[in-house]
Amino acid sequence: MSVTGNFFSKLRSLALTLEKETAQLEQVFGNEDNEYEEESPMRVLHDLRSDIMVLKGDFQSTLDKKLTRGQELSAFIKACRVLHERSAADIEQIKETFQTYGYKPLCNDNSENEQTQESEKPKDNDVSPRKADAEDLPILEKAASTSWDLLRAPQLSDFGLSHYQLPTAWEPPKVKPCPKNPEEEKPRIMYKDPEPINVAKTPKCALRLEEDFSQIQHFGISDCSTNLNDDYTIALINKNFQKKQNDTENETCQAKNLKSLLATPSHLSHRMDCVDSPLPPVFFTPGLKVHKKETISLPGKTGERQGLNAADTDSTLLSGTCDRKDSDNAHLEDVHECTAMKPAMDLKSISAAPPYLSLGSNFDSVYSPRPPVFCTPGLKTHKKETSSVLVEPKEVTGCSDTPPLPSFQTNWLKNDTTEKALDITEPVPRPELSYRQYLEEPPSLVLNSNKYEAPAMTEYDIGTPTRPEMTVSLTEDLFKYNVKPSSPPKMSEYEKMLWTPIRPEMTSCITEDISQILSKYCDNNTNVADKEMWNKAGASFGKISSEYEDKENRQY
């Protein structure tokens, strides 16, 4: 029984140990799971791998930077080599240019020294590389002793440029110092004011050793006198002002001299004609001469004399303008008629004249001419002798100052029954052109004053010269055969204004219908007596009607 009992006891102990081991293993396995709950191994592995990747990227970036820097360094080295080659080529060119001017390079001596050193080198292999490098370097010459004066002028050798051998002309000239004689030396005169001001010095400004104020100027202002003295600046300003005045005077003199030199005769004549204060211009009609008659002193007040001033001036103009040299009988009859009609005219009739006949109430406008009379200079008028029987004019129902209506007559359209043959062989008489009798001196300007006396009334009347009578056949033949008188002398522009316009040539014939229409407006049955009546009636108004008639009957 002992054998079976031992077997079961051993089996029981084995089962207990297995149970203990299984419980222990379960406990250990449970404890390990609790320890790795906060951080799992996969997480740790991922973090470790990410750290490795970051380190790898940093290493790659640093490596790239190193490569780029190496490339830049290599490019810089290449540029330095190229620059070295270029500088060497430039140095060779400079040496060649210097050699043309006598420069001797020193590289031959260096090459000979290098060759001697290479021949003297021992061929031992035990020599260290440092000693070999030291032997390869050229032996430097000992620097010259620096015993020169530090205050001397700098030389090219001080900067290592003595081998360029620059020309000696650039060096400053060496002047030998002259021995100084103590007798010839004079003390330097210090600057002093011409009139120094004695000013009491304050205790702070008191000087004991030096009294030299050569660099200090008071400019005329001090504690004692706070006013500006006449110092150098004011004198300089006055001097400049005088110079400017002299310059302006010289410029004005030069300008005057230049104007006098460049002045032409026209400028000189204009300068002589011009006055500082010219009188107002006098307007007059050429050919209209006004004769001033001797005045008769009449008793009376000055006011009445001034009141009659306008009437007297009108009568004076009428008397002056009628003083013409005319030998025709018709003109003499007009003059006699004018003398007969003058006494009947009074002050009221003159003052009631129309505006183109009245001279106005201005007393300063004495001897003011009437509107100009346009006549043909040099053309004599021949009138036929008429009977001296005076025809009484008809009474006008309207205003006496109103001129009669002009008669529209075209004399050149009248048919002349007696046709005259024109003899071309006979020379046409040249009209006598005399301009001097029309162009005479104008009357002097008379100013209004208390001493002025009204001129006496004269028995003359102004009138327009009558137009010469020309037959129709003569004028037509003249224009037909283009027979023209000789050309008159040259006239000025002012005389051309008074010249009667020339009748144009008629190139087209007027038809019978037009002549019949025009004949209705022409009063061909009027007798000579009626014409003389109209002329005499218009003479009292300055013969305005005759002017209109002449304008309408003018042969264009």
UniProtKB/Swiss-Prot annotation:
InterPro entries on file: SKA3 (IPR033341)
Bias kind Basic and acidic residues: ranges: 118-134
Example of a GO MF term: microtubule binding
Alphabetical list of CDD domains matching this protein: SKA3_N
Gene Ontology process terms (BP): attachment of mitotic spindle microtubules to kinetochore; cell division; chromosome segregation; mitotic cell cycle; mitotic metaphase chromosome alignment; mitotic sister chromatid segregation; regulation of microtubule polymerization or depolymerization
Keyword annotations of the record: Cell cycle, Cell division, Centromere, Chromosome, Cytoplasm, Cytoskeleton, Kinetochore, Microtubule, Mitosis
Gene3D superfamilies per UniProt: 6.10.250.1400
Cell compartments where the protein resides: Cytoplasm, Cytoskeleton, Spindle; Chromosome, Centromere, Kinetochore
Keyword match Cell cycle: yes
Function comment: Component of the SKA complex, a microtubule plus end-binding complex of the outer kinetochore that stabilizes spindle microtubule-kinetochore attachments, promotes alignment of chromosomes at the mitotic spindle equator (chromosome congression) and assists suppression of the spindle assembly checkpoint. Kinetochores, consisting of a centromere-associated inner segment and a microtubule-contacting outer segment, play a crucial role in chromosome segregation by mediating the physical connection between centromeric DNA and spindle microtubules.
Complexes and interactors: Component of the SKA complex, composed of ska1, ska2 and ska3.
This protein's name: SKA complex subunit 3
Species of origin: Xenopus laevis
